[in-house]
């Protein structure tokens, strides 16, 4: 497990992850936040973790948070606090997330033209009736030396 608040590079300079504990019905689970640097340099934050000072310092060191993505109705808990820390970021997600947590204030849904254009290197994938995610569609990671 990656230490909470520490972003581990999955693909150097492009993709990072951090894991954090969450409690669900008395069971301790791990959740993962993924950060992608888009081709224009903006950061895309998928399923945000709690925006602690350490997390925000790590994100700020990577670049400007432009997109906060609530991927489905289950991964909404830290979106309001993250949006408050990054008020210029767009919050994207399904209406079901906002219905489940009224504090989630969506800027737009993932099918709106502005979001589709800005994140064209990402392709949405449907994982089930209630779950969806994104994958890189036109990304070629640099080859290791």
Residue ranges and their predicted role:
Residues 5-54, 135-145:
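Conserved beta-strand hairpin/beta-sheet module of binuclear metal-dependent hydrolase folds
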Residues 50, 93, 126-129, 139-141:
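Short, structured patches in soluble enzyme cores that scaffold and shape functional sites
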Residues 16, 69, 92, 123-125:
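Hydrophobic/aromatic beta-strand patches that form the interior of the parallel beta-sheet core
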Residues 95-135:
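Metallo-beta-lactamase
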Residues 1-3:
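Basic, glycine/lysine-rich polyanion-binding surfaces/domains
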Residues 50-93:
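Active-site metal-binding motif and surrounding structural segment of the metallo-beta-lactamase
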């Amino acid at each position: 497990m990656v230490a909470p608040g520490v972003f581990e590079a999955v693909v150097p300079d492009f993709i990072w992850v951090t894991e954090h504990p969450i409690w669900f019905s008395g069971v301790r689970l791990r959740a993962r936040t993924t950060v992608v640097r888009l081709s224009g340099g903006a950061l895309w934050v998928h399923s945000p973790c709690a925006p602690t000072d350490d997390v925000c310092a790590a994100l700020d060191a990577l670049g400007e948070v432009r997109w906060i993505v609530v991927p489905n109705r289950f991964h909404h808990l830290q979106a309001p606090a993250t949006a408050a820390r990054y008020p210029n970021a767009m919050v994207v997600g399904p209406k079901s997330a906002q219905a489940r947590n009224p504090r989630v204030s969506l800027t737009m849904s993932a099918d709106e033209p502005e979001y589709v254009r800005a994140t064209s290197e990402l392709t949405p994938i449907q994982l089930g009736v209630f779950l969806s995610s994104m994958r890189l569609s036109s990304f070629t990671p640099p080859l290791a030396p």
